[in-house]
Regions:
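Rhodanese-like catalytic fold shared by cysteine-dependent sulfurtransferases
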Residues: 1-21, 28-71, 82-130
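Short, surface-exposed ligand- or partner-binding patches at beta-edge/loop junctions that are enriched
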Residues: 75
Length: 130
């Protein structure tokens, strides 16, 4: 089952459960230039320019999360790629999958800008830019 949590709820869970692993599934460019949560493991679900699913995604996650009962929190830009990545992990036997609603940047606002309506960064949670 895939659970949905707000960024704040996800942060709270990570503070309470040291087995929890946050996986940032965005591209290398997003991760480096837009910023990323401190402590997140970066494993892209899809990568530009062809936007094909990373065939090594599940294998790469297994390197960081051996316990399939540990909470695995997934984050993308706005919450869609992370759901797809969570489904792949669910098929691989992971039991505690958490999609972070609104991702890192949140939904588009009325001016088609991200970062003003929600997401990890908007919530004031720890993040850095490379």
């Amino acid at each position: 089952m895939i659970e949905n949590l707000t960024p704040q709820q996800a942060w709270d869970l990570m503070q309470q459960n040291t087995d929890a692993v946050l996986v940032d599934v965005r591209t290398k460019v997003e991760h480096a230039f837009v910023g990323h949560p401190i402590g997140a493991v970066h494993i892209a679900w899809k990568e530009a320019p062809d936007w094909q699913v990373n065939a090594q995604f599940v294998t790469d996650v297994k390197k960081h999360v051996q316990d399939r009962n540990a909470p695995v929190l997934l984050l993308c830009r706005s919450g869609q790629r992370s759901v797809d990545a969570a489904k792949a992990l669910e098929e691989a036997g992971y039991q505690r999958l958490i999609n972070i609603i609104d991702g890192f940047e949140g939904s588009l606002d009325s001016l088609n800008h991200r970062g003003n309506l929600g997401g990890w960064r908007f919530s004031g949670l720890p993040w850095v830019q490379s």
